[in-house]
Every structure is written in structure tokens, then in C-alpha cells.
């Protein structure tokens, strides 16, 4: 099993994407397509929250066609980040993080 490592910067956050194709021969045999694994981790700042994960780390499995239709691991993750960054919850969290807290 090969592993691809992709490094990107999104909104000033350095992010590592690990992509492992075809992680389960049993899945491929049962469903006729490979099951791929994606890991996304914010590196700098370390474990910085992202619109797709509050902890700065995400690990999920996807059928190969999802990865391919998204344009590959990097394009797919960038599209997710941009899409979920438009959510009202993410926008509110970003505003809150930028404001000073006088009581802590």
C-alpha cells in the first residue's frame, strides 16, 4: 500500500494531507472499487481548528470514486475547507477567536 503526502497552506494554516489508496482488498472485492483513506492534520499552528475538524485532525475512509470526482486528495480537501468555511458556525468561531477576552 502506497502513501502520498501532500502539504498545503490554507488561510495561513499549514496542513498535511496523507492519502492511502486501496486500503481494503475485502472492500474492493465486495463493492468492486477501492476504499481509500484520507488524513488531514493542521501542522502550523499545530492542531489548529479547521472548518472540517475542531481538533485540527481528520481521518476518514472514502470509496475511490469520491476522491477522483473531487479532483484528487488535495483538491478535495481544499474544496471542503472552502465550502465549510462559509458556514455560519465557522464564521462565528473565527470572529470569537479574534476578539479579546477581558475575563480570562
Residue spans for each PLM region:
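Amphipathic, interaction-prone secondary-structure segments
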Residues: 1-34
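Acidic, low-complexity intrinsically disordered segments
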Residues: 37-104
Amino acid at each position: 500500500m502506497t502513501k502520498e503526502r501532500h502539504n498545503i497552506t490554507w488561510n495561513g494554516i499549514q496542513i498535511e494531507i496523507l492519502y492511502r489508496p486501496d486500503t481494503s482488498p475485502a472492500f474492493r472485492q465486495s463493492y468492486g472499487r477501492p476504499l481509500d483513506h484520507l488524513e488531514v492534520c493542521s501542522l502550523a499552528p499545530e492542531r489548529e481548528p479547521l472548518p472540517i475538524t475542531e481538533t485540527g485532525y481528520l481521518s476518514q475512509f472514502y470509496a475511490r470514486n469520491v476522491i477522483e470526482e473531487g479532483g484528487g486528495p488535495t483538491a478535495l480537501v481544499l474544496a471542503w475547507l472552502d465550502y465549510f468555511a462559509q458556514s455560519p458556525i465557522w464564521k462565528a468561531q473565527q470572529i470569537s477567536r479574534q476578539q479579546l477576552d477581558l475575563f480570562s
